Every structure is written in C-alpha cells, then in structure tokens.
Amino acid sequence: MKKNPSSPAGCPCGKPRAYPDCCGRWHAGALFLQAPDAESLMRSRYSAFVLDQLDYLLQTWHPDTRPSELEPNAADVKWLGLQIKASQQQDDTHATVEFVARLRQAGRATRLHELSRFVKEEQRWYYVDGDIR
C-alpha cells in the first residue's frame, strides 16, 4: 500500500525540499530510477520505505541480491528519520553509504545503523547489500 508523504514541507529523507522535488522525482515521472549517486539512491530508498513503495525498493535493489518480494511496513511502524553518517565513492561504479534510520515499532524506538554498498550498472545505481553496525 503506497502512502502519501506526511509532510508537504519536507521530504521523508530529511532534506528540506518538498517530496516531489526531492526523492519523489526518482520514484516517478521523467527521472524515475535516475538517482544520480549512491547517497541520493539511499535517501530515495529510505523515503520509499517510509511510503511503502515496495516496487521502487525492488527495482533499485541489485538483481544478484534482490529478494523475491518485500512486506509492507507493519501498522505499528513509524519511521522517524534518516541520518547519513558517511558517503564514499570508491570509483565510478562503486560507492558506500553509512546511515542511521530511526523508527518506532509497537511504541519501542529502534535504530538501524548500516554501511550499504551500491553499484552503478548501465547508468543506474543499485543497492547491493549492507553490514549492520
């Protein structure tokens, strides 16, 4: 089930731009799937998690590591924010992004701290996998 961004003033990824001008442009429209770098893809994937845009998450996951399906957020999950700790480009086609995503589930606060790996193939960035920190 797709949701609408909760705040028209700011994107779910934490940038001060409105969703359509930030991650929304990678989720649909002329720039669909065209995030220009790994950090932009990471932010757009976080927003897709917040908004339950499962098709986008699967399409931006590298085919070699992509699951066959994803489950939508449980009803008691509330995403609270994203912090990019580091973003490094190893070469033209490989990058890492370290992030902390905060969420609350069943009233309990949780942090997901991950170092994610990305690869660029045929002019598109893909999430490959990550190490939980």
From Swiss-Prot:
It comes from the Bacteria. It holds the Pfam family YchJ_M-like. InterPro entries: NTF2-like_dom_sf, UPF0225, YchJ-like_M. PANTHER family: ADENYLATE CYCLASE-ASSOCIATED CAP C-TERMINAL DOMAIN-CONTAINING PROTEIN, UPF0225 PROTEIN SCO1677. Belongs to the UPF0225 family. This is UPF0225 protein BP2036. It comes from Bordetella pertussis (strain Tohama I / ATCC BAA-589 / NCTC 13251).
